[in-house]
Every structure is written in C-alpha cells, then in structure tokens.
Amino acid sequence: MAIYRLAELLETRFRRSFLKRAWIAKTPRAVLARPDSFMNVCGPVVARLAKSFGQPLVVHDDLDLPLGALRFRMKGSAGGHNGVASVIAHLGTPDFPRLKIGIGRPASKADVVDWVLTRCEGADRETFNGAVGRAAEALRSALDTGLDRAMTELGT
C-alpha cells in the first residue's frame, strides 16, 4: 500500500510487466515495483527486478513493531518474515535496505496467519493508514535526500 501512495506522490502509475512478473511505475528518480506474486514467494521476482534496475529497497510489514511504527534498516535477517526470507534467498544476501511497517502482534500465537492476512478495522485501520502515508513520505524523502538522511528524519 505504501508503494501505491508513493506512486501518487510522484504522480506516476503502475503498469503490468508480464516479462518481469510485476507491476512497475518508472519515474526519473526510481523504479517502483510490486511483484505479481504472494509476498512469501516474491524472492524470484525481486531478484529479477534487481538484475534489471539495481538494488531494491523492500517495504514490508513487521509483527515485531507496534502498529503504525516505521523503521528503516540497511540490512538484516528475515526476522521470521517468510517474504523477506524469500528475497534474501534469491538475492543471495541480506544486505539490502528495507522499510518496515509495524502491524503489531495478535493476542494469541495461533492467530498470526489470520492477523497478517486480515484487514484491521476501526482505530487500528486509521493508525495503519497513517503509517502507510508516513511510509510513502519517508520513501519520497529517501529519493529526495538519500536513505541516510531519510533514516535520520524518521528516527531509525
């Protein structure tokens, strides 16, 4: 969702690339891409995109961050995130930047899959939507001023 909000801010639109198996929006400053696959198995598509366009900055949800929190990281482990593990496996390295959007954890461990796949409602939805907007602004800042400065501005 943050990548779509960023596309709006940059006044560009996504187009489907069957060759790359992704939705792609090109701008003078960056190529935005959303793999046309489930997050858990997006690694092959991200690796293909990286070969064409350079190192990715991956945006993903994070159970270990409170709902609405944002955090840039320059590299790191998958932290239990299957989609990030897929990207690491197919890029062959954990050394790529990422922006994590906190979704918090459910009350019960058994509910994790449903928690990740279900839309939040009410006040949680407002908090999440606010985080998506802030994430898009942070990504635009990274394009405008560089990732290091955007990380400082975000406080991560």
Predicted regions and their residues:
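Hydrophobic alpha-helical segments within soluble ligand-binding/sensing domains
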Residues: 80-83
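Short glycine-enriched, charge-decorated loop/helix-capping segments at active-site entrances
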Residues: 71-78, 116-120
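Nucleotide and nucleotide-moiety/phosphate-recognizing core
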Residues: 1-75, 85-99, 106-111, 126-155
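Active-site oxyanion-binding pockets that recognize sulfate/phosphate
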Residues: 121-125
